């Protein structure tokens, strides 16, 4: 059976819940600041288990935001790629000037070695998956270009990855250590495949955008040319 960590504000005095939650978030996720949108009432629960080197955490909480500053990112000991996959509510991830939002049936990936912010503007139930970054490198794929992206989850390999992450978390209490390790390795492989697919989609979109730019530039330069035609473009 995989070892687990359970944290809950149920046994904490109401006035102490917010600071306790901030401390748990900071400790469990390796340096993460949080705030509660100014709310004074709060309740939250976290349950985390390991599938080999993969950490899976179910988080239930009132609305809150988290922030990883550049200083905290630099001070981190272990680099992870991190996934948020909501069961309830939404999560909006900001990193590297990009923003991506996920709800039930979707997931977003980001990098703990860089600064980021996540908004959870309503009560949420999230599955948060942490994958060792040094095991996720894929030849020919620039991971940085894929961070803060909505990877998917509705169909294809990204849906297989999502369902595997969810099922693994739910079944970890019934797994041996070896089985849990194998499940973690499977999750990493499915996420790699999802990122490869996303990289291909991003490349195709970039190529289409570049073609449109070239067409607009050609038309602008030859707008007064009587020989300008669709065939010429």
Model-derived regions: residue spans:
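Alpha-helical bundle regulatory/interaction domains
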Residues: 1-45, 54, 90-232
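Short, well-ordered beta-strand micro-motif
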Residues: 50, 58-60, 130
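Glycine- and acidic-residue-biased ligand/ion/polar-headgroup-sensing regions
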Residues: 52-54, 61-66, 71-93, 106
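Generic beta-structure capping elements
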Residues: 59, 86, 132-134
């Amino acid at each position: 059976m995989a070892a687990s960590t359970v944290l809950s504000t149920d046994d904490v005095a109401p006035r102490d819940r917010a600071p306790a939650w901030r401390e748990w978030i900071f400790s469990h996720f390796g340096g993460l600041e949080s705030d509660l949108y100014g709310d004074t009432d709060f309740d939250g629960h976290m349950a985390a288990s390991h599938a080999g080197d993969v950490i899976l955490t179910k988080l239930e909480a009132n609305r809150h935001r988290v922030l990883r500053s550049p200083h905290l990112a630099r001070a981190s000991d272990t680099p992870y790629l991190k996934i948020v996959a909501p069961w309830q509510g939404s999560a909006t991830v900001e990193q590297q000037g990009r923003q991506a939002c996920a709800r039930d049936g979707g997931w977003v990936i980001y990098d703990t070695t860089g600064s980021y912010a996540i908004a959870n503007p309503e009560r949420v139930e999230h599955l948060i998956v942490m994958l060792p970054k040094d095991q996720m490198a894929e030849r020919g794929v620039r991971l940085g270009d894929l961070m803060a992206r909505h990877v998917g989850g509705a169909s294809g390999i990204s849906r297989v990855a999502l369902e595997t992450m969810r099922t693994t978390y739910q079944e970890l209490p019934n797994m041996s250590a070896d089985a849990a390790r194998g499940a973690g390795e499977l999750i990493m492989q499915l996420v790699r495949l999802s990122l490869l697919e996303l990289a291909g989609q991003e490349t195709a979109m970039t190529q289409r955008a570049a073609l449109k730019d070239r067409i607009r530039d050609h038309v602008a330069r030859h707008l007064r040319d009587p020989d300008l035609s669709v065939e010429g473009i």
